[in-house]
Amino acid sequence: MTLLWCVVSLYFYGILQSDASERCDDWGLDTMRQIQVFEDEPARIKCPLFEHFLKFNYSTAHSAGLTLIWYWTRQDRDLEEPINFRLPENRISKEKDVLWFRPTLLNDTGNYTCMLRNTTYCSKVAFPLEVVQKDSCFNSPMKLPVHKLYIEYGIQRITCPNVDGYFPSSVKPTITWYMGCYKIQNFNNVIPEGMNLSFLIALISNNGNYTCVVTYPENGRTFHLTRTLTVKVVGSPKNAVPPVIHSPNDHVVYEKEPGEELLIPCTVYFSFLMDSRNEVWWTIDGKKPDDITIDVTINESISHSRTEDETRTQILSIKKVTSEDLKRSYVCHARSAKGEVAKAAKVKQKVPAPRYTVELACGFGATVLLVVILIVVYHVYWLEMVLFYRAHFGTDETILDGKEYDIYVSYARNAEEEEFVLLTLRGVLENEFGYKLCIFDRDSLPGGIVTDETLSFIQKSRRLLVVLSPNYVLQGTQALLELKAGLENMASRGNINVILVQYKAVKETKVKELKRAKTVLTVIKWKGEKSKYPQGRFWKQLQVAMPVKKSPRRSSSDEQGLSYSSLKNV
């Protein structure tokens, strides 16, 4: 029987198609009316012809002898098929201009067509139906309607949508409300009231998806309708203000030189207003940018706050501004349902700063030259500068330090080194500079113990002056004893400094104390005839290493002449 019905339906459908295909008004596929329903739930779909395309209703069409025919195209197929209205329990049925599914299945997804026709008239339209699945939290790919509530505006309600016509008014359904996954029960400011959900005070925390599940009986069966909508809390009209222009303002002046790029932002704040059209635009000399000849580009960006307050920014750009452009009037305008405002930007031509190129170059060159001269002077005369400072501002190190000698001289005991020490060093340091030297062979008493007296002399001296020569590094000499004692005293107590004077070059030595001393201490080199003059670099280096002492130097020309002549004869 079912097979016979299918064959007959296809036969008559083919006849209808062939007769009416050439003269039927086909409105095509109305994608704007895509219908989405949940699987295993009932759905009722009205033919869109009577709602959007035709000027008469179904009753008028039926009275005029027109017949409404339904057929469909399965998903991913091209073949149009008649709808089977003989399924068990009348799962799919038609009632006047409504197509019923009790309930829908996933394979019901496709494009459905309703055709109104008779022998002289034909009109049809198709629309897509999508059956979707939902999870336990009512999540699905379905597009959700958005309902906006005013923040802190008093009691507001939302209503469970799209449930009219599914059951008669005599049936009392059961309605359960959810926020996300959670059943709404004992919420602070949200109260279910049947088909309505009341918000006592809408807050930002109330943003989210709300679902109503409507359960009703029909012919001994129980059906469920699931409807989800998104609640968005927006700014209250009580707090709405006219547009506020943040930029341009009186505090910012756009100064540009001809040829530079001119960028002027117009930033406007709009309070949220339901169905308000927010507009921002520029005028240049009272005209819109499109009505003038200059090359102007305007870029716009829009951002929203959590309560849907809007900030619009339009940036006016002129790539290469001219002197004439900098004299024009640039005004930003804004309009909303609350009013219209305008603000002019302050634009002017930048006055070029005077250029002191030559003066700056000369000043910079003079500064560099002065710095170079100072560096050279310091490098050449740093010894003189140190000695000058010590002579006038230095603190006398010899006061109350308990020392008897300024310098203990350590040297190799042979004729050449002794002559250098006794005549040259002693002559200048004692006679010219006024230092008190301790020379063991001169100042020690006969019969004493050499080791004890050596250590005693070193402890009584402020400096240990070591005269280095090849003979100095011979093992077992008194000179090495003096060196070791001085270095140990300097390292452990710090009350004596060691001065190294190289009288003659010393090759590699196995004396580790001397190796260590030459690594950490500066060596003052004696250069023979070049170093004999008391005002020469050798003696100045030696003076810097000596203790600061406020003792008058011998200044008579006779004594200086004698000393210098004696040095020349050494």
From Swiss-Prot:
This is Interleukin-1 receptor accessory protein. Residues 389-570 are cytoplasmic. The lineage of its organism: Eukaryota, Metazoa, Chordata, Craniata, Vertebrata. It catalyses: NAD(+) + H2O = ADP-D-ribose + nicotinamide + H(+). Residues 549-570 are annotated as: Disordered. Glycans are attached at residues 57, 107, 111, 118, 196, 209, 299. Coreceptor for IL1RL2 in the IL-36 signaling system. Coreceptor with IL1R1 in the IL-1 signaling system. Associates with IL1R1 bound to IL1B to form the high affinity interleukin-1 receptor complex which mediates interleukin-1-dependent activation of NF-kappa-B and other pathways. Signaling involves the recruitment of adapter molecules such as TOLLIP, MYD88, and IRAK1 or IRAK2 via the respective TIR domains of the receptor/coreceptor subunits. Recruits TOLLIP to the signaling complex. It comes from Homo sapiens. The TIR domain mediates NAD(+) hydrolase (NADase) activity. Self-association of TIR domains is required for NADase activity. The chain crosses the membrane at residues 368-388. Its EC number is 3.2.2.6. SMART domains: IG (SM00409), TIR (SM00255). Residues 69-85 are annotated as: Essential for interaction with PTPRD.
